[in-house]
Every structure is written in C-alpha cells, then in structure tokens.
Regions:
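Active-site mouth of glycoside hydrolases
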Residues: 26-217
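Boundary at the C-terminal end of the N-terminal hydrophobic targeting segment
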Residues: 19-23
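Bacterial N-terminal signal peptides
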Residues: 10-18
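Bacterial N-terminal signal peptides that target proteins for export
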Residues: 1-9
C-alpha cells in the first residue's frame, strides 16, 4: 500500500509543479490604454507618451543580402527574424530613452515570389479558396517574445495589422488571396475585408507562447 501512496503523492506533486509552470505570467501593466474623447487614459489617469517608430522589432530587412533576383518586381528584398537577444536589446534601448509607448510595424502578408526568395511572412495564404488567412506560427512566436519582452521592461506597444504598401506584403497581397483588388480592402462587403477582420480576431485571441496570456487579456 505504501508504494502506491508514495506514487500517488509523487504524481500529485508533479501535477502541482506542472500547473505552476504553466500558469500565465502577470502583466507589468494594470490596464489597457483606453480613449475618452481625444484623451488617452491609463485607468483613470491621462496617458501621454513619446517614442520613435520601431519597424524591425519583429521582422528585419536584410539589406546586406541585396535584392532577390527571383522577384521580377525589381525590388525583392530579403527578410529575417530577430533573435530574442536583439529584441531585448532594442527594447531596453527604447526604454532608456524615456519611451513609454512604441509603434511597431505591421504584420507581413505572403505573396507569390516569397517562396523563390526564401521569404517568410506573418500571414499565410488560406488553405482553401474561400478560407481565411493563417498565422505563421514561427513568425508569431517571434511576435510573442517581442510583446513579452516589452511588457517585462514596461514598454507599451502599438500593434497595427495590415500594411498599405506591397513591398512588405499588405492590402494588395491580402486581396490577391481572393482575386480582389487592393481597394476592396475598404469595402465592408468584400472577402478581403472579411479576411482582415479574421486576422485581427486570430491575433487578439492568440495565447502568447512566452507569457501564457491571451493577447486580449
């Protein structure tokens, strides 16, 4: 009987330890920033901030590699994902300048020449003609770490979703998934607009793989 009791006790302790390890980390912040008319609020306090644009916190333009000749658009840039150390260093530098909030760049959208150029993006094409775009898990784990590191260091992030421009992969590339035009992004009855809303849904309901918290939490 004793061996069985010991086994059950060890199992219970193991489960409790695992539960603690999987518990979501608490945020550095108490509130999301809200708007009251023209005023931004942190709880019941007015929130004011200044910061610089930080476009490479979650995807880097790899200028050193030059243009990708497999991209006939005459531009064809290469990209790479930043390391956790790079993200930590950049965010620390921003905080040391006094920044309280920072805008990062939009999520990148897959387009037809990416495969030939070895380019990875945040948003992948639907698996079916009428399906919704998919998030690239590899890219989103980099994004997760950016958010977690910013939270840890007390930096708020402004997270836009889809680009106006094609070079990064934006509204034109999102529309191309459904054989629509870039302008259809603004038509609320278009497949492109529906896809845009679904991208937002996927992001804000995502559970951060570093903190264990949902983005909306």
């Amino acid at each position: 009987m004793k061996p069985m009791k010991n086994l059950l006790l060890m199992g219970l302790l193991s489960a409790l330890a695992s539960g603690g390890a999987l518990a979501a980390e608490r945020s550095h912040f108490t509130h999301f920033i809200t708007r009251d008319g023209a005023t931004l609020k942190d709880g019941d306090k007015v929130f004011r901030f200044a910061g610089i644009h930080a476009p490479e916190l979650h995807r880097i333009e790899d200028d050193a590699r030059g243009p990708c000749r497999a991209d006939p658009r005459g531009w064809g840039q290469y990209f790479k994902w930043p390391t956790a150390q790079e993200q930590q260093n950049w965010i620390q530098a921003m905080v040391q300048t006094g920044a309280k909030a920072q805008r990062v760049y939009v999520l990148s959208v897959q387009q037809e020449f990416d495969k030939a150029c070895g380019r990875e993006t945040h948003i992948l094409a639907p698996e079916t003609a009428d399906g919704m775009p998919r998030l690239n898990e590899k890219a989103m784990r980099v994004y997760d770490n950016m958010i977690a590191e910013a939270d840890k260091q007390g930096l708020r992030l402004i997270l836009p979703f889809i680009d106006h421009w094609w070079w990064w992969g934006g509204r034109e590339q999102l529309a191309a998934f459904y054989h629509e035009k870039a302008e259809d992004f603004y038509r609320t009855d278009s497949k492109t607009f529906k896809a845009y809303l679904d991208v937002i849904r996927q992001v804000i309901t995502r559970t951060n793989t570093v903190t264990g918290r949902a983005y909306y939490d």
